[in-house]
Amino acid sequence: MKKNMYYAISAPSGTGKSSLIKTFLNTNLGMNFRLSISHTTRNIRSEEIEGKDYFFISKEKFKKMIFEKKFIEYTYSFNNYYGTSFKEVKNKIKSNFSLFFDVNYKGVKKIKEFIPKLISIFILPPSKLDLLKRLYNRYNSNEFELNKRFYKYKKDILNYNKYDFILINRDFNNTLNKIKTIIISKNKKAINQIDKINETIKKLLKK
């Protein structure tokens, strides 16, 4: 039986995390991986598919699942709940798949209690300007939404040094290849360029 691997990827909104995960899953290396599908209470978007992107449920049902301790981890963000259920993860593990988790740092900590060998990857934007452009395009210049997302992004990156690997997404294909390298070699020194990352963090945290 093959040895399964478990990876959590975190990133501020608009950094390209979801696209990187989806593209990786369609590569030869990604064939043995599955994405752990989260539950959420937010509305489904036109391009999304129930059970593939998320399990979309009501807030009442989500709260019931919290009460019944059915989540490994959950969070409340921008007026909606998001969570990883024990059932989803156990079913994927039982099917002998390696797993990707799309969660924030608190989620990483909780999942690591359940799966100690979880490896965490944090993805940063190349610059604050680049991130603002992506957020602007995504949220149609809604100033209130932009400010909320940017405030959360500054909180997200404060935990960057608690991850196993840190990548700066300057180029999509290059970042994708680095994720593959992490999975193949798990060589931290080959990936983390600490001085460059620290300098990027300082710039990203500037007002």
Swiss-Prot record:
Its recorded reaction(s) are: GMP + ATP = GDP + ADP
Q: Which Pfam families match?
A: Guanylate_kin
Locate the Guanylate kinase-like domain: which residues?
4-184
| Residues involved in ATP binding | 11-18
Localization: Cytoplasm
Q: What class of enzyme is it?
A: transferase
The organism's place on the tree of life at top rank: Bacteria
Its recorded name reads Guanylate kinase
Taxonomic lineage per UniProt?
Bacteria, Pseudomonadati, Pseudomonadota, Gammaproteobacteria, Enterobacterales
